[in-house]
Amino acid sequence: MRLHHLLLTLLFLVLSAGSGFTQGISNPLSCRLNRGICVPIRCPGNLRQIGTCFTPSVKCCRWR
């Protein structure tokens, strides 16, 4: 019975940790950790948008 609880807990941790990777970048810290920069308008030509920083108008951009 203890083994079932341990396996269920492990499964829960794996599935809950993976759910964060499906969401986009939405704050400045996660933008910087993903090697991005916050740009107040749109990303320049040699950068691509990977998320937002503060609001949807502030983009998180990274080199292509």
UniProtKB/Swiss-Prot annotation:
Residues 1-26 form the signal peptide. Its main location: secreted. InterPro entries: Beta/alpha-defensin_C, Defensin_beta-like. Disulfide bonds join 31-60, 38-53, 43-61. GO terms for cellular component: extracellular space. Gene3D superfamilies: Antimicrobial Peptide, Beta-defensin 2, Chain A. It comes from the Eukaryota. SUPFAM superfamilies: Defensin-like. The keyword Disulfide bond applies. GO terms for biological process: cell chemotaxis; defense response to bacterium. The keyword Iron-sulfur does not apply. It holds the Pfam family Defensin_beta. Inducibly expressed in enteric epithelial cells. GO terms for molecular function: CCR6 chemokine receptor binding; chemoattractant activity. Keywords: Antibiotic, Antimicrobial, Defensin, Disulfide bond, Secreted, Signal. It is found in: Secreted. PANTHER family: BETA-DEFENSIN, DEFENSIN BETA 4A. Has antibacterial activity. Belongs to the beta-defensin family. LAP/TAP subfamily. This is Enteric beta-defensin. The gene is EBD.
